[in-house]
């Protein structure tokens, strides 16, 4: 019996992949740091063993899958090589696995996790579908027809894949610790496009994506009239969004989605276009769109007294704009309060003015200290550099969250890719203690 051992099993992609293999009746275990991470809940539900790092975890007969964050000098990887056990990097293993199915890669600077989750949910309503989402969610079906997965452009990892289809949501400059500029990002997506085997579904409203060259058909979607799939007559409501879809200027159907903001319409359009191309029943698509409950850390909302709390992974100015827009659509009468933790010094420095501009669209802004990456030097930048660019912005720590109580009818949006949830948890605890 083959045992799949994951080095760094709590990573979002690694956790998802472990769940898929387990669901396909394989024996799975893994190791990681002992600090609790949100991805391990799904692993624990499946009774997948999570061990502390130890070279003795590695045994002959295992298949070793290593997370990209762990170097070849990691004790378990060294142990595997000493035993002549091949070590598969996450993205290479995933590339091999998907070749057995009709595979759909979802990529883009923003929106890929939400779009992957939505596509997986919609496809499941029509055909057996396995999926891997970048929020740590994975699901494997032994007799799958489709394999839907999130493909990240960071360090060009997505070039390990040769999918049948690719959805490209947008191209934007991010990860300044790796990419030099927007042209460098574009070159990565262009290289990816040439590896797609059947078709590309791309947002035609994105100027960079319009320049993509491919050996396969490129189907464009968006709001502009030149797109193959166009959303028209958009009704933005507090219970979701309704819009008509026109295919090459001919009315196709009317769809309702549970999401808010223009970005949610675009994500749904991408899914509708792919399903149309694959002849998925439109009634199944319409039904599944109305039952989608979202993905982890993307506009996750809960009421707390008179306030509403939203947890969101937004960590780039474009994403902050989208999240604030969505909050205003759903809660037009409420004050919008942004609690933001910048993620990495390199990103914060590169987009300092853009962060200030996007955050200023909230009614009030609170800033947490910058969450640095282990790979980078702090440099000269401080959170005060961002604060002074935003009128009325205040600094906040996990011990001073009680200041948020004054926003009695507020939507409190906790945004960031670091440990922003620590601040949210501190505030929830503060409110609960006060109520006793």
Swiss-Prot record:
Q: Per the UniProt record, which residue ranges are transmembrane? A: none
Quote the EC number. Answer: 6.3.2.8
- Gene3D superfamilies the UniProt entry points to: Mur ligase, C-terminal domain (3.90.190.20), Mur-like, catalytic domain (3.40.1190.10), NAD(P)-binding Rossmann-like Domain (3.40.50.720)
What is an example of a Pfam family matching this protein? Mur_ligase_C
Which positions does UniProt annotate for ATP binding? 108-114
Q: What class of enzyme is it?
A: ligase
Q: Which GO terms label this protein's molecular function in UniProt?
A: ATP binding; UDP-N-acetylmuramate-L-alanine ligase activity
Enumerate the UniProt keywords alphabetically.
Answer: ATP-binding, Cell cycle, Cell division, Cell shape, Cell wall biogenesis/degradation, Cytoplasm, Ligase, Nucleotide-binding, Peptidoglycan synthesis
Q: In which pathway does it act?
A: Cell wall biogenesis; peptidoglycan biosynthesis
- Main localization category: cytoplasm
The reactions it catalyses are: UDP-N-acetyl-alpha-D-muramate + L-alanine + ATP = UDP-N-acetyl-alpha-D-muramoyl-L-alanine + ADP + phosphate + H(+)
Q: Give the matching InterPro entries.
A: Mur-like_cat_sf, Mur_ligase_C, Mur_ligase_C_dom_sf, Mur_ligase_cen, Mur_ligase_N, MurCDEF_pg_biosynth, UDP-N-AcMur_Ala_ligase_MurC
Q: Where in the cell is it found?
A: Cytoplasm
Q: Which GO terms describe its biological process?
A: cell division; cell wall organization; peptidoglycan biosynthetic process; regulation of cell shape
The yes or no answer to whether the keyword Cell cycle is present is yes
Q: Name one GO cellular component term.
A: cytoplasm
Which PANTHER family does the protein's record reference?
UDP-N-ACETYLMURAMATE--L-ALANINE LIGASE, UDP-N-ACETYLMURAMATE--L-ALANINE LIGASE-RELATED
Q: What does this protein do?
A: Cell wall formation.
**Protein family according to the UniProt entry:** Belongs to the MurCDEF family.
List the protein's name.
UDP-N-acetylmuramate--L-alanine ligase
């Amino acid at each position: 019996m083959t045992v799949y051992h994951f080095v760094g099993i709590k990573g979002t992609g690694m956790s998802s992949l472990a769940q898929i293999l387990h669901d396909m009746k394989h024996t799975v275990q893994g190791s990681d740091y002992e600090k609790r991470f949100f991805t391990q809940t799904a692993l624990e539900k499946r009774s997948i063993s999570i061990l502390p790092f130890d070279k003795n975890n590695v045994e002959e007969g295992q298949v070793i899958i290593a997370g990209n964050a762990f170097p070849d000098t990691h004790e378990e990887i060294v142990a595997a090589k000493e035993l002549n056990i091949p070590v598969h990097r996450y993205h290479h293993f995933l590339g091999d696995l998907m070749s057995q199915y009709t595979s759909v890669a979802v990529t883009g600077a923003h929106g890929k996790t939400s779009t992957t989750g939505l596509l997986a949910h919609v496809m499941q309503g029509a055909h057996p579908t396995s999926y891997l989402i970048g929020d740590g969610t994975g699901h494997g079906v032994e007799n799958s027809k489709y394999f839907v997965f999130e493909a990240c452009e960071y360090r060009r990892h997505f070039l390990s894949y040769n999918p049948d289809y690719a959805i490209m949501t947008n191209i934007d400059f991010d990860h300044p610790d790796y990419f030099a500029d927007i042209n460098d990002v574009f070159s990565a997506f262009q290289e990816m496009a040439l590896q797609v085997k059947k078709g590309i579904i791309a947002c035609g409203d994105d100027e960079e994506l319009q320049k993509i060259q491919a050996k396969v058909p490129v189907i464009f979607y968006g709001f502009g009239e030149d797109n193959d799939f166009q959303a028209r007559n958009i009704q933005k409501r507090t219970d979701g969004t309704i819009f008509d879809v026109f295919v090459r200027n001919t009315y196709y159907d009317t769809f309702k989605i549970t999401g808010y903001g223009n970005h949610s319409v675009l994500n749904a359009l991408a899914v509708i276009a792919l399903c149309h191309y694959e002849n998925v029943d439109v009634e199944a698509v319409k039904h599944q769109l109305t039952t989608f409950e979202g993905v982890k850390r993307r506009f996750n909302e809960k009421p707390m007294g008179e306030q509403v709390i939203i947890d969101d992974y937004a960590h780039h100015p474009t994403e902050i704009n989208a999240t604030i827009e969505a909050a205003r659509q759903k809660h037009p009468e409420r004050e919008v309060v942004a609690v933001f933790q910048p993620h990495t010094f390199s990103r914060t420095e590169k987009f300092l003015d853009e962060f200030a501009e996007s955050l200023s669209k909230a009614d009030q802004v609170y800033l947490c200290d910058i969450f640095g990456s282990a790979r980078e030097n702090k440099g000269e930048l401080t959170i005060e550099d961002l604060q002074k660019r935003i009128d009325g912005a205040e600094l906040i720590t996990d011990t001073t969250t009680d200041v948020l109580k004054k926003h009695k009818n507020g939507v409190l949006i906790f945004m960031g890719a670091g440990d922003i949830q620590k601040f949210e948890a501190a505030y929830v605890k503060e409110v609960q203690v006060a109520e006793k």
